Every structure is written in structure tokens, then in C-alpha cells.
């Protein structure tokens, strides 16, 4: 659980504005999460998250004051790109990043909620499939969907996944789950706020890849 517990996201402020710098710093440590899933088929999601973080950071670094919050980025780019927006720049990168982050959130929440295949309780296929269905599937064409369906069958046992997530630390399953629940508090609130922002600014897109 050390992988997540060491980099908790900040509590969401009352105005629900997410500061870009601290957000990028926290989520930059999340791509190794997919290594814990074992299958190399999850590598594209990992690479997508890393690539989108890099794209957003490149924009942020040009003027940290102007792009202090994620909403600032969308607002500035909307004025900058005109008709091309939102399918451009850091706005597009954050669009896809939030989906990858939602996958992690739904997956971990499902495990914490005890959702499982009663015939194979130590498999995490049910949890990974739910996360894929809710976060990514509708944005993927049939070929990509087929690849990820195969990946779900290569997902590790829950016990092995939690051990990998804990970086080999000697902790009980319940201790690990409790730390995941703690991580999810601010993480879920932040992801929800990003989704709300995209809806309010009419920046959501539903094309497939």
C-alpha cells in the first residue's frame, strides 16, 4: 500500500478548484500502479497516464501563475484555441488522464467494497472489469476492447496484487485495504471534481480510439 499512501492528494477546497502543481506531483507517482496488475497488456493505460501528465506539465511550466488551477488551463486554452478546443492541448490530455485515474479509483473502490467472484474470491477480474466498463470501455473501439478483455484474464490474484501494492511490506490484507480507503477519500473527490468541471465547461468528448 506504500505505493499509494506515500502520495495522498490534497483535500479538495470549498471552491473545488484543483491546484495544478500539487495535483501533477501526486498523480505522477501513480503509473507504477499498473505494474502491480502484472499483465503487460495494462502497459498502454500506464503509458497513456504518464504521457498525459507530461503534456499537462509542459503547459503548466510555461506559466505556473496563469495555469495555477486545472480550470485555469481549460479556460485559457478555450480562448487560445477557439473552435479546435477542447480536442487539443492540455485540455485533451487531462480529458484522457481523468479516465485513466477513474479506472484506478473504481478498481480500488470495488476491491474495498468486497465485490468479487464468489467462485474465485481471490481473483480481481470482477474488479478490473468493472473499472474498465465504467472508465474506459465506451471510448475504445472493438479491437482495443478485445485486447483489454484478454488482459482481464491475466490479472493477478488479489493477495498478490495487494502485496505488490504494499511493496512487499508485511501487512495484513485488512491493513492494506484500510490504507486504500484512506487514499481514496481525497483521490475520489478530486477525480469527481475534474469530471464535473468538464461537464460544466462542455469540454467532454466521446470519440473512440
Curated annotation (Swiss-Prot):
InterPro entries: GLTP_sf, Glycolipid_transfer_prot_dom
Keywords: Acetylation, Cytoplasm, Lipid transport, Repeat, Transport
Any GO MF annotation of the entry: glycolipid binding
Function, as annotated: Accelerates the intermembrane transfer of various glycolipids. Catalyzes the transfer of various glycosphingolipids between membranes but does not catalyze the transfer of phospholipids. May be involved in the intracellular translocation of glucosylceramides.
Taxonomy of the source species: Eukaryota, Metazoa, Chordata, Craniata, Vertebrata
Chain positions with N-acetylalanine modification: 2
Protein name: Glycolipid transfer protein
Subunit structure: Monomer.
Chain spans, region 2 X 12 AA approximate tandem repeats: 45-66
Sequence repeats by residue range: 45-55, 56-66
Residues binding beta-D-galactosyl-(1->4)-beta-D-glucosyl-(1<->1)-N-[(9Z)-octadecenoyl]-sphing-4-enine, per UniProt: 48-55, 140, 207
Family: Belongs to the GLTP family.
Amino acid at each position: 500500500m506504500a505505493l499509494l499512501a506515500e502520495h495522498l492528494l490534497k483535500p479538495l477546497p470549498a471552491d473545488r478548484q484543483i491546484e495544478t502543481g500539487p495535483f501533477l506531483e501526486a498523480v505522477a507517482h501513480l503509473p507504477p500502479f499498473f505494474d502491480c496488475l502484472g499483465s503487460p497488456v495494462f502497459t498502454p493505460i500506464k503509458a497513456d497516464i504518464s504521457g498525459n501528465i507530461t503534456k499537462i506539465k509542459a503547459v503548466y511550466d510555461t506559466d505556473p501563475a496563469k495555469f495555477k488551477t486545472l480550470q485555469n488551463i481549460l479556460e485559457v486554452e478555450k480562448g487560445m484555441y477557439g473552435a479546435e478546443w477542447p480536442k487539443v492541448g492540455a485540455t485533451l490530455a487531462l480529458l484522457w488522464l481523468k479516465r485513466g485515474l477513474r479506472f484506478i479509483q473504481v478498481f480500488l473502490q470495488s476491491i474495498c467494497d468486497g465485490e468479487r467472484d464468489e467462485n474465485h474470491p481471490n481473483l480481481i477480474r470482477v474488479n478490473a472489469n468493472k473499472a474498465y466498463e465504467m472508465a474506459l470501455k465506451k471510448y475504445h473501439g472493438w479491437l482495443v476492447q478485445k485486447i483489454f478483455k484478454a488482459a482481464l484474464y491475466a490479472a493477478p490474484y488479489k493477495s498478490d496484487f495487494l502485496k505488490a501494492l504494499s511493496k512487499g511490506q508485511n501487512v495484513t490484507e485488512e491493513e492494506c485495504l484500510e490504507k486504500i480507503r484512506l487514499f481514496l477519500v481525497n483521490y475520489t473527490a478530486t477525480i469527481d471534481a475534474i469530471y464535473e468541471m468538464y461537464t460544466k465547461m462542455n469540454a467532454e468528448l466521446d470519440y473512440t480510439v
